[in-house]
Amino acid sequence: MTPLIFVTGGVVSSLGKGIAAASLASILEARGLKVTMMKLDPYINVDPGTMSPFQHGEVYVTDDGAETDLDLGHYERYVRTRLSRKNSVTTGRIYENVIRKERRGDYLGATVQVIPHITDEIRRCIDEATAGFDVALIEIGGTVGDIESLPFLEAIRQVRTERGAEKAMFMHLTLVPYIAAAGELKTKPTQHSVKELRSIGIQPDVLLCRSEQAVPDSERRKIALFTNVSERAVISCPDIDVLYGMPLELRRQGLDELVIDQFKLRDKVAAADLSEWEAVVDAVKHPLDEVTIAVVGKYVDHQDAYKSVAEALKHGGLRQRTKVNLTWLEAQDLEGSDMAALQGIDGILVPGGFGDRGFEGKVQTSKYAREHKVPYFGICYGMQAAVVDYARHVADLDAANSTENDRQSPHPVIGLITEWRTATGEVEKRDEKSDLGGTMRLGLQEQRLKPGTLAREVYGKDVVAERHRHRYEFNNRYRTQLEDAGLVICGKSMDDTLVEMVELPRDTHPWFLACQAHPEFLSTPRDGHPLFIGFVRAAREKKAGGKLLKEARA
């Protein structure tokens, strides 16, 4: 039976439960334990796939094609375990499963209720996702006191009652606000948050106290007294300059020791080796170079919509001790402009998106980068914009477009994928009338790279696998025509049916590459990703006038 650490949040949302949980997971992993993570989200959507990026932020995609909460991105950036559909569960999915069972007659005519049927299904999902691991951390979304979270909190209360403290731990993240007028930290919100938690039968074992500054020992003692938590288990989580330094901070305060002692794992663990995290923090704090990258997107007002892209760019810089400054530009604002906003930029990245709003701005951005020899990296919709630009302005295919935006285009160089083969070999089919949710080409797919291309050089191997999330694809009817016009198709699906990656010849552009997949989902601070590392290096070379004076590695 896998020991479980349940992470809840109190007082306010957005305190960083996911980061705190992932940081602890990374420490436990560094001590030799096999660790997994899970997110329980209280919203009624089956998954975040159809939710607005402005409201929910990024949709993170796993290897098996699950569209999940962006917190799973945090988890995979901190731990080596690759997560799946099992690791992201919503209220919508739970109710969908229960209703399906009820329709099949699995409950033998019983009245289906929140307790025990909904809570039992939650517990079943937890068991399924965590089996076979030394420790599992499970984050419960929302804030204690929300009505939506109650079934999840009741389910984890039952788990603790059944398994005992040696197999289930409660960790509560709460806010300790600093009141500037009084010049002091206030512990009352934390006391009330724990009181709320205890009223539904959950006594925290550990408190993580988020604050602007370190919580002094006197306040920690006060919190311990009023919440019935050991003073040793009241952990200060102040704001820090480098988020990837959180594992080091929690290790310094002995949070992992609390877990090991409560779960009696002493004979399974080794000394914590956090040297990789120390190297990451050192690279952030002591850069040797600096570049500015423009991200031209549709949802830049809510930058969480591009969370993995922003992190992957920073990771690409970390691997060569380079600080990456991001300039966020709204694609729609660039339509019909003189593109002055892109002057002085070292590199341009155009990320994914859906719909016609801002697409012409992305096409103009691709044209600007191509003509001005600025390093260009297109992802998903960014690749489609690059293909449309090339078709219109180089291949003389006037009014070329994607059928997503213009179904009457005389040259639909981007079209709906109607059929493709999944990673498991199954054939999937779609049409214009298919549901939006869960109907895209999703998950990890292999592709073969063309020898002698920039893509092949950057990756350093012939076959690579990337995660996908898209409904439209390069139209094969235009392959030959665009290749004859000079576009290099440098990556194709293993069955040669889908164009995965395009680039410009290096004798016409120093670094212009666009991919249909989402490589940002496989980038981590400790390893980076070949495409992002190569892109940042190209930006450094542009800034240095074509030749780097000094190579730097983290």
Swiss-Prot record:
Biological process GO terms, please? Answer: 'de novo' CTP biosynthetic process; CTP biosynthetic process; pyrimidine nucleobase biosynthetic process
Q: Detail which positions bind ATP.
A: 14-19, 71
The reply on keyword Protein biosynthesis is no
Give the region (Amidoligase domain) as residue ranges: 1-265
Per its UniProt entry, which superkingdom is the organism in? Answer: Bacteria
Q: How does it assemble?
A: Homotetramer.
Protein name per UniProt: CTP synthase
Q: Please give the organism.
A: Xanthomonas campestris pv. campestris (strain ATCC 33913 / DSM 3586 / NCPPB 528 / LMG 568 / P 25)
The encoding gene is pyrG
